[in-house]
A protein has these predicted regions:
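Short, Lys/Arg-enriched N-terminal segment that forms or immediately precedes the first helix
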Residues: 1-10
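Short, cationic-aromatic polyanion-contact patches
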Residues: 12, 66-89
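Pre-recognition alpha-helix immediately N-terminal to the DNA-recognition helix
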Residues: 17-24
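Helix-turn-helix DNA-binding helix
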Residues: 18, 49-50
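Alpha-helical DNA-recognition elements
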Residues: 24, 55-56
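Short helix-capping/hinge SLiMs at alpha-helix to coil transitions
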Residues: 24-30
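A short alpha-helical element within helix-turn-helix/winged-helix DNA-binding domains
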Residues: 32-41
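A short, conserved structural fragment
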Residues: 58-68
Length: 89
């Protein structure tokens, strides 16, 4: 017996901005953005603010990264599709 899939609310406008920044950075530079660069771009006072956005995006399978490794934050296919308007998010 499978449990019913719980539908998540849409991502917040700020989460969409962070996702877009990650995707644009990767497309423009050919390598992944760092947590510090996200903090600087969004003027987050604490690195924890970026981490909270990243974790929320990862729970929705919109970004991925390798913990403990530098420059591994990237959008997933689902994240790219959401930004292209092919998904509700």
């Amino acid at each position: 017996m499978t449990s019913p899939q719980v539908e998540q609310p849409p991502i917040t406008p700020r989460q969409r901005e962070v996702l877009g920044f990650i995707a644009r950075f990767y497309a423009d530079h050919g390598y992944a953005v760092t947590n510090r660069q996200i903090c600087k771009a969004f003027k987050f006072a604490s690195p924890n603010a970026a981490v909270m956005h990243l974790k929320a995006l990862r729970r929705r399978d919109l970004v991925t990264w390798q913990p403990g490794e530098a420059r591994t934050i990237r959008p997933t296919q689902a994240g790219v599709e959401l930004l292209e308007g092919n998904s509700d998010g």
